[in-house]
């Protein structure tokens, strides 16, 4: 059976959300087994079966709107097909039954909703998108005030495994000097805490109800795919929608 993660947060009645793991699919190594990514070399039939299993396990009301993620900061407002382009790293919806989704395999998935349960969003935040402002752009799509927005940080590479060069630290500090607290020197490189960086960015725009951020895709190899660990691997996905 497909194993799902259900966010532990004060979710409004009108909102549903879940995040997949690598457990419960049909894909063969190195995509074993619940790979949802059709772009990483897996058998397309296996990916389709995995998606069917996931949609059933998560009780999704419709097929998710899959994005063409490019490590940027653009947000696609889900108003119904057809879309001129799905090239974006976040999606927003205020329409019941429309599923926001992002794929990850180390990058940070962030799910959003407002306390009233009338708006939702999902963002893909790798370090480039996070630094460029994808979370801030997503928050700006909400009609509600930032203090009424909840954010859940899904499974990403943890602070003991995310080694980066000095240029990554410098890029974040150029935007916010407080970002230095999220980097620890590790030889001639740094260990970066993507969860802390996300919390800083969200707090800077008034979002302070932040949950999750306690898993590591890199070290929890039996539960999660990790691009940095395995290079050729599958993808998880995180979903949120209005009921």
Swiss-Prot record:
Q: What is its EC number?
A: 2.4.2.1, 3.5.4.4, 1.10.3.-, 2.4.2.28
Q: Which cofactor does it need?
A: Cu(2+); Zn(2+)
Instruction: Print the keywords alphabetically.
Output: Copper, Hydrolase, Metal-binding, Oxidoreductase, Transferase, Zinc
GO BP terms: peptidoglycan metabolic process
Q: Do the record's keywords include Ubl conjugation?
A: no
Instruction: Please indicate which superkingdom the organism of origin belongs to.
Output: Bacteria
Q: Which Pfam family is one of this chain's hits? A: Cu-oxidase_4
Q: Which spans are transmembrane here?
A: none
Q: Name one GO molecular function term.
A: adenosine deaminase activity
GO annotation, cellular component aspect: cytosol; outer membrane-bounded periplasmic space
Substrates-to-products reaction catalysed: adenosine + phosphate = alpha-D-ribose 1-phosphate + adenine; S-methyl-5'-thioadenosine + phosphate = 5-(methylsulfanyl)-alpha-D-ribose 1-phosphate + adenine; inosine + phosphate = alpha-D-ribose 1-phosphate + hypoxanthine; adenosine + H2O + H(+) = inosine + NH4(+)
> What is the deletion mutant like?
Cells lacking this gene are more sensitive to ampicillin, cephradine and cefoxitin than wild-type.
User: How does pH influence this protein's activity?
Assistant: Optimum pH is 5.5-8.4. Maintains 80% activity at pH 5.0-9.0.
Q: Does the keyword Zinc apply?
A: yes
Positions bound to Zn(2+)? 71, 107, 124
Q: How does activity depend on temperature?
A: Optimum temperature is 44 degrees Celsius. Maintains more than 80% activity at 50 degrees Celsius.
Q: Which family does it belong to?
A: Belongs to the purine nucleoside phosphorylase YfiH/LACC1 family.
Q: Give the record's subunit note.
A: Homodimer.
Q: What does this protein do?
A: Purine nucleoside enzyme that catalyzes the phosphorolysis of adenosine and inosine nucleosides, yielding D-ribose 1-phosphate and the respective free bases, adenine and hypoxanthine. Also catalyzes the phosphorolysis of S-methyl-5'-thioadenosine into adenine and S-methyl-5-thio-alpha-D-ribose 1-phosphate. Also has adenosine deaminase activity. May also act as a polyphenol oxidase: able to oxidize syringaldazine and 2,2'-azino-bis(3-ethylbenzthiazoline-6-sulfonic acid) (ABTS) in vitro.
Q: What is this protein called?
A: Purine nucleoside phosphorylase YfiH
Which species?
Escherichia coli (strain K12)
Ranked from the top, the taxonomy reads: Bacteria, Pseudomonadati, Pseudomonadota, Gammaproteobacteria, Enterobacterales
Q: Which gene encodes it?
A: yfiH
